[in-house]
Amino acid sequence: MTGINAMAPAPEVVSWAEAVEQDNAPHIQEGADGTRTETAFTEVDGVRWKVVTQFKVINKRVPKVVADRKKWVKFGSCKGEPAGPQVATTYVAEEVDMQFTRNRAGEQILDVQEDKQTAKTTSREHCRHCKGNDHWSTHCPYKVMYQLDEEADADKDTEKDRMAMGMRPDGRQIDRNRSDENTCRVTNLPQEMNEDELRDLFGKIGRVIRIFIARDKVTGLPKGFAFVTFESRDDAARAIAELNDIRMYHMVLKVEWTRPSN
């Protein structure tokens, strides 16, 4: 038995205007996978164009805030347009997930270099030996060499100062041997500390006869050590006991007996 599929008769075209309008009307075809193909004709500057658009409607669950955002009223170039993206103002493309890889080893090297550069420009660290700004004097790799030179220069400067200042402030002669016995050697002295501050500090212990701060001959900056002479040896001993290992600025003072000149 043979079956014949009867096709619906084509609508009757009354006039040519209706034929043109029917020909220009969009035609929508829906595929098996839910994809819709819309074919339309448009005329621009006397040229007829065929526009084919494919789209697929997908229903998915979204957060409530996303759904509410789709209800916002459009503005600007999209003012008055219906919901959804518009071809004239919105370009819809595939979502691409980007993953940024990080070279941790290279970042660590860069961080160390930046830290060193920052330390050179902003650090308060300062070495009184090599004049570097990346470490303290106690961690200077040339500390031993500089200390030997400083002690040699200090002995020379102290001897000259003793010869030039052989008188007490009141004009009386100072016994050199007695002066050596009553003198304290102060090391690890901050560069910010001057003679007045040193006199105020040691003057609380007893009467100070003389204070000498060793300075660089070229720059005039303190070398980091000084000599304080008391009138009494007992005061010098108390100064060593009370002022040794106290903190001044960023340094810790070392107060001890001076070495005999002979």
Curated annotation (Swiss-Prot):
Pfam families: eIF3g, RRM_1. One of its GO terms (biological process) is formation of cytoplasmic translation initiation complex. It is found in: Cytoplasm. Belongs to the eIF-3 subunit G family. Changing C127Y: In ju1840; represses the convulsive behavior due to cholinergic hyperexcitation caused by an acr-2 mutant. Component of the eukaryotic translation initiation factor 3 (eIF-3) complex. Its main location: cytoplasm. Disruption phenotype: Abnormal morphology (dumpy phenotype), slow growth, sterile and in severe cases embryonic lethal. Residues 182-260 form the RRM domain. RNA-binding component of the eukaryotic translation initiation factor 3 (eIF-3) complex, which is involved in protein synthesis of a specialized repertoire of mRNAs and, together with other initiation factors, stimulates binding of mRNA and methionyl-tRNAi to the 40S ribosome. The eIF-3 complex specifically targets and initiates translation of a subset of mRNAs involved in cell proliferation. This subunit can bind 18S rRNA. Keywords: Cytoplasm, Initiation factor, Protein biosynthesis, RNA-binding. The gene is eif-3.G. PANTHER family: EUKARYOTIC TRANSLATION INITIATION FACTOR 3 SUBUNIT G (PTHR10352). This is Eukaryotic translation initiation factor 3 subunit G. GO terms for cellular component: cytoplasm; eukaryotic 43S preinitiation complex; eukaryotic 48S preinitiation complex; eukaryotic translation initiation factor 3 complex. SMART domains: RRM. One of its GO terms (molecular function) is mRNA 5'-UTR binding. It comes from Caenorhabditis elegans.
